[in-house]
């Protein structure tokens, strides 16, 4: 009896073909309407799954298939024509801020990174903008929270942007302590919220701290002990971070203002007036944002461009 019921519910070959064709058509239409571009392997995998197993693949595609968000775009200054630098021209075509001279200081170990991070927080005079995927419930995270709260109590405007997935295990006491001190806290795409659109797997992994729109601390480290000092007798993870100032820091501040305005559904704020620090630059740097809010796969495109431009190896 059960086998007979299953057979009655199973589609015929023609019905399966029709459902598969409609699923593939749905993929083509949504991809065209959104203007999305995928790697050939990813596109082939989606089409094969939709054609062969549409009953499972189509719901997965509708839930997780979207690659990009569509927040309001950033207005960037474009380079003068004829730069003859392929990388600069490529990034300018993507609408990214141009390269600028900066004073760069690298931190190759966690102790140096922690010292640089906390020094920047303590030297802030006007504002601090923080974006991180993880804010740890550990001495490093608690120390960062205390310093941010202290700066806010001293009259510094402090804003903290956390990712909704990375903040799932964050104790509410951290957020309460920050808000009680006057720190503004926002969550990028809260995991269990119905607000907004797009799949929940599109996250904000940016890790940066901008002080007075002039100094930037960034790199691969989240604000958690395992990235700096280690925890539970374990050595810290090997990672790298840096601080720099001037033009690239302003580009990072502009990106944070855009991210914050998107989450809060408001207009981005105006940046502070730039400070002339001529003569302290040590390198030419460029802010290269990537993620679901960028219309292009910026880092991937730059790596491919470098491969095509290679002359010797």
What is the meaning of each model-derived region?
Residues 1-305, 309:
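N-terminal localization/anchoring segments of enzymes in phospholipid and broader phosphate metabolism
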Residues 313:
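Phosphate-/nucleic-acid-contacting segments
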């Amino acid at each position: 009896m059960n086998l007979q019921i299953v057979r009655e519910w199973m589609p015929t070959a023609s019905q399966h073909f029709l459902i598969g064709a409609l699923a593939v058509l749905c993929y083509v239409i949504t991809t065209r309407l959104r203007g999305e571009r995928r790697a050939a392997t990813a596109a082939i995998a989606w089409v094969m799954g939709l054609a062969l197993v549409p009953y499972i693949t189509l719901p997965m595609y509708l839930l997780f298939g979207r690659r990009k968000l569509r927040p309001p775009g950033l207005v960037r200054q474009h380079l003068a024509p004829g730069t003859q630098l392929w990388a600069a021209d490529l990034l300018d075509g993507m609408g990214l801020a141009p390269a600028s001279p900066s004073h760069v200081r690298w931190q190759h170990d966690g102790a140096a990174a922690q010292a640089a991070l906390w020094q920047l927080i303590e030297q802030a005079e006007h504002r601090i903008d923080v974006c991180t995927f993880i804010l740890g419930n550990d001495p490093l995270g608690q120390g960062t929270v205390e310093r941010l709260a202290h700066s806010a109590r001293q009259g510094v405007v402090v804003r903290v942007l956390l990712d909704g997935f990375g903040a799932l295990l964050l104790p509410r006491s951290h957020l309460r302590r920050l808000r009680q001190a006057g720190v503004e806290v926002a969550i990028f795409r809260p995991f269990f919220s119905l607000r907004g659109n797009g799949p929940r797997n599109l996250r904000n992994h940016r890790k940066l701290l901008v002080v007075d729109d002039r100094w930037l601390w960034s790199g691969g480290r989240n604000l958690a002990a395992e990235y700096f000092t280690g925890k539970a007798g374990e050595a810290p993870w090997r990672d790298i971070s840096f601080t720099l100032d001037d033009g690239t820091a302003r580009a990072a501040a502009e990106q944070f203002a855009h991210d914050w305005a998107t989450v809060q559904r408001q207009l981005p704020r105006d940046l502070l007036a730039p400070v002339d620090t001529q003569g302290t630059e040590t390198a030419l740097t460029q802010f290269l944002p990537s993620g679901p809010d960028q219309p292009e796969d910026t880092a991937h495109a730059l790596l491919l461009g470098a491969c095509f431009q290679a002359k010797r190896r």
